């Protein structure tokens, strides 16, 4: 008589963890960094339509790496949860902690009960009235949730990018300085730059997805920085002679106001309220 196949629960959990980590490691890195006026999202993402970064609610943002179809479904579920809770109770009852806990429960249930875990890693960020009240929640494939200070890094090169940020990050940086530090950290490990493939020293605007949660904006704090608004900030880095590995310098505070040519951000007078879904998105499939 043939003995039935058996695997211990510990072995099953190890196999699931290894499978999920391999999927996440193929994704390009994302950095979420706090700065003086809010929270900055920086992602290496050459796609202009499949986003890694999006808005969940008035002052709450979302970033992810991994399998696009899986975390896009989580993003949509988060938007719906926030809208229903805000409509049923009060908009102030929608917090980053509430959404992070809901994500943690879903990820944990899938990891323990389903054969295949989600190959995703998430960050839920909430901008507060002051820098001390900003919140960054990091969620992993098994439902673990951690409240991170200062910054969160996700993706295949997360450890190397985190080490670079720990060396150069300063609390209270302006937008331009925070962007410089984040792009430098991502560029140092990217195969698209000179460090990996003989390309430019820093990632270009076409290779980046950048957005902010600006605490000074009324109602909806989320705003994307792209095109004509992003290029001057990156060009300023090259003019200052910033290259990967160079010691940083403290820049003057640069207010995060929209620049000419920037797409209409959520909450702008010229952009109508679209009910919490406009400007949100997911990531391109992992490569």
UniProtKB/Swiss-Prot annotation:
Residues 276-287 have a biased composition (Gly residues). Its main location: cytoplasm. PROSITE patterns: PROTEASOME_ALPHA_2 (PS51475). Transmembrane segments: none annotated. GO terms for biological process: modification-dependent protein catabolic process; proteasomal protein catabolic process. Pfam families: Proteasome (PF00227). GO terms for molecular function: threonine-type endopeptidase activity. The formation of the proteasomal ATPase ARC-20S proteasome complex, likely via the docking of the C-termini of ARC into the intersubunit pockets in the alpha-rings, may trigger opening of the gate for substrate entry. Interconversion between the open-gate and close-gate conformations leads to a dynamic regulation of the 20S proteasome proteolysis activity. Residues 262-275 have a biased composition (Low complexity). Keywords: Cytoplasm, Proteasome. It is found in: Cytoplasm. CDD domains: proteasome_protease_HslV. Pathway: Protein degradation; proteasomal Pup-dependent pathway. GO terms for cellular component: cytoplasm; proteasome core complex, alpha-subunit complex. Residues 241-287 are annotated as: Disordered. Belongs to the peptidase T1A family. Component of the proteasome core, a large protease complex with broad specificity involved in protein degradation. The 20S proteasome core is composed of 14 alpha and 14 beta subunits that assemble into four stacked heptameric rings, resulting in a barrel-shaped structure. The two inner rings, each composed of seven catalytic beta subunits, are sandwiched by two outer rings, each composed of seven alpha subunits. The catalytic chamber with the active sites is on the inside of the barrel. Has a gated structure, the ends of the cylinder being occluded by the N-termini of the alpha-subunits. Is capped by the proteasome-associated ATPase, ARC. This is Proteasome subunit alpha.
């Amino acid at each position: 008589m043939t003995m039935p196949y058996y695997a211990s629960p510990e072995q099953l959990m190890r196999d699931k963890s290894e499978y999920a980590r391999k999927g996440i490691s193929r994704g390009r890195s994302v950095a979420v960094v706090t700065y003086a006026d809010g929270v900055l999202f920086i992602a290496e993402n050459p796609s202009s339509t499949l986003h890694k970064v999006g808005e969940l609610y008035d002052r709450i943002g979302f970033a992810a790496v991994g399998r696009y179809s899986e975390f896009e479904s989580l993003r949509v579920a988060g938007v719906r949860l926030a809208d229903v809770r805000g409509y049923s109770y009060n908009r102030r009852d929608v917090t980053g902690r509430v959404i992070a806990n809901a994500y943690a429960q879903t990820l944990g249930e899938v990891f323990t009960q389903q054969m295949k875990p989600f190959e995703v890693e998430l960050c839920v960020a909430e901008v507060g009235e002051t820098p001390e009240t900003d919140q960054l929640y990091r969620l992993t494939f098994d439902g673990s949730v951690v409240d991170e200070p200062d910054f969160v890094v996700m993706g295949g090169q997360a450890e190397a990018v985190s080490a670079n940020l720990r060396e150069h990050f300063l609390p209270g940086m302006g937008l331009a300085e925070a962007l410089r530090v984040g792009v430098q950290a991502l560029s140092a490990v990217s195969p698209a730059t000179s460090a990996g493939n003989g390309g430019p020293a820093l990632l270009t605007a076409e290779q980046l997805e950048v957005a902010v949660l600006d605490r000074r904006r009324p109602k909806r704090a989320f705003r994307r920085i792209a095109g004509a608004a992003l290029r001057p900030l990156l060009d300023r880095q090259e003019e200052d002679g910033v290259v990967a590995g160079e010691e940083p310098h403290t820049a003057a505070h640069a207010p995060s106001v929209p620049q000419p040519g920037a797409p209409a951000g959520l909450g702008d007078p010229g952009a109508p309220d679209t009910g919490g879904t406009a400007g949100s998105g997911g990531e391109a499939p992992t490569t």
